Each structure stands twice: as C-alpha cells, then as structure tokens.
C-alpha cells in the first residue's frame, strides 16, 4: 500500500483540519465568557474589599460628632482606595436607616457608617448578561456597605 493511501485510510490528517474549529469553539463559547465572568468577579471582590478596608480604617478613628458627618467626612474619604472612590459617608442611627441627628442619636441606638462606591465593567462577550444595572450606564454598579460602630 502506498503512503498516500495509508494516510487516507486512517485519516491522520483530519485532526489538522479539526483543531482550528475546536480552538475557535473553545475560545468564543467557553473561555472568553468565563474570562468575562472572572474579570467582573475580581473587580466586584476588589471593590467590596476596598469598602471593608475603608470601614475598618474609620472604625478605629471614630468621628468626634456623630450628628454632623460633614465636619470629618472629607478627611476620611481621602483615606479610601483611589481605584474605588467613596463620594460621601452617611451616619445612620437606629434600625430605620435615618440619618443621625440630635433626636435619634441616643446612646442606646445602634449607629452605622454607610458609604458606597461604583464599579464599571467592560465585558467582551457577555455584555447583555452582565450589564444589567439600573444606573445611567448599564455596566456601572453601585456597591453599598455599612459598618456598625456603636
């Protein structure tokens, strides 16, 4: 049997034609969507950890006046991670999520710091699935975090 007939009989060359199709299938339908999900997940986890770290930093240096956050919030927001800026800090007293003032800041009421940051994701493949935010940019998500301090 000749060499050409031998190769055609066991079809060893067929894999050379199948590999590009399999590679394209794996890249477009499996790996790129998984990469999109992983990138969004890492960005979310990083932002949430930045919020937790910020909460710990202000937990160990409490505000001098819980009824007036405007006097100290500018200095503490400067301590936040620059990749995840925190626009404002709100002090909430009690379980009703009301902003602290002289009427609801009794020592028996629990007090919380509440603050937010925004992340923007740029998925390559799964834009219609991952970009579902109600913000003006559907790929931008606002994360809220609260830390009890009293």
Regions inferred by a protein language model and the residue ranges of each:
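A generic structural micro-environment signature
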Residues: 23, 64, 97, 127-132
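Short, solvent-exposed coil/turn segments
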Residues: 10, 108-110, 138-142
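Residues embedded in well-ordered secondary-structure elements
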Residues: 36, 104-106, 134-136
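A short linear-motif detector with a strong N-terminal bias
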Residues: 18-20, 37-38, 69, 93-95, ...
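Short amphipathic secondary-structure patches
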Residues: 49, 53-120, 146-148
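Alpha-helical assembly-interface signal, strongest on the long, hydrophobic N-terminal helix that forms
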Residues: 2-77
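Low-complexity, S/T/G/P-rich flexible repeat/linker segments used as non-globular hinges
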Residues: 118-150
């Amino acid at each position: 049997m000749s060499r050409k007939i031998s190769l055609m009989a066991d079809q060893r060359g067929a894999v050379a034609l199948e590999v590009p199709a399999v590679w394209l299938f794996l890249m477009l339908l499996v790996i790129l969507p998984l990469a999109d999900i992983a990138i969004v997940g890492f960005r979310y986890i990083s932002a949430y950890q930045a919020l937790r770290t910020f909460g710990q930093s202000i937990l160990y240096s409490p505000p001098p006046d819980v009824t007036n956050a405007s006097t100290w919030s500018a200095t503490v927001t400067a301590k936040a991670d620059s990749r995840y800026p925190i626009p404002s800090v709100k002090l909430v007293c009690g379980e009703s999520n009301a902003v602290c003032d002289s009427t609801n800041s009794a020592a028996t009421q629990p007090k919380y710091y509440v603050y937010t940051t925004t992340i923007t994701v740029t998925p390559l493949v799964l834009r219609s699935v991952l970009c579902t935010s109600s913000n003006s940019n559907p790929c931008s998500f606002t994360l809220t975090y609260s830390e009890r301090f009293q």
